[in-house]
Amino acid sequence: MTYEKKAPFRANHVGSLLRPPELRQAREKREQGELSAAALREIEDRCIRDAVKMQEDVGMQGITDGEFRRTLWHADFLRQIEGVKVVEGLSPDSAKRFQNPDADVQRSPTQFVVTGKLHHAHGIEVDNFKFLASVTRQTPKQCIPSPSLVHFRSGRGGVDKTAYPEMSDFFADLAAVFRQEIAQLAAAGCTYLEIDDVNFAYLCDPKMREGVRKIGEDPDKLPALYASLINECIKDRPPDMAV
């Protein structure tokens, strides 16, 4: 059997791996002020090296860092966009119970609001990608959350009308932020980018569709809107970058 030399590969994985106990405990200590940022980074580095080895040992060609740098798969990225604010616990009715052994983990979805003009202040995942690339022999795959997540749970009501009287300007600036991040990742050597978007699946769920209507959005129109937004984000990617 021949194997692809260039992404996308026949066998792929999302790449968000279960955090090892050492990393979970270290993050808890960091949140409680008992561990420095530098010490946490060292533990993350070690756990990422182990995750990379595991993926390589089973024959994966596209290697991720397990998203071990993040507390939440999307919020840690999106909160670094200037003008975006993370708000948690706004929808108790939509709280989800996660299936841990005791079934006692429940949390409301994270929402995002736009408080001012959007700006890409710095490379968000660039340094993380560079570390991953330095510790794998295979193709490093970088995952970023979809831009649609900034809009999905809050809609027009979550976008400051002084900053953005017109939603078209908001979406244009949001796409520009992602283009800048993607350009910096490309400059760092990224040739395999994954954009994680759960909202297309959510829009197949009747309850989620009703929630979209409650915030004044049309669930039948959002798929095309979000597809156009993502296409705007990736339109300037280099020819050798697979998305």
Predicted regions, residues:
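Domain-level signal for soluble alpha/beta catalytic cores
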Residues: M1-V243
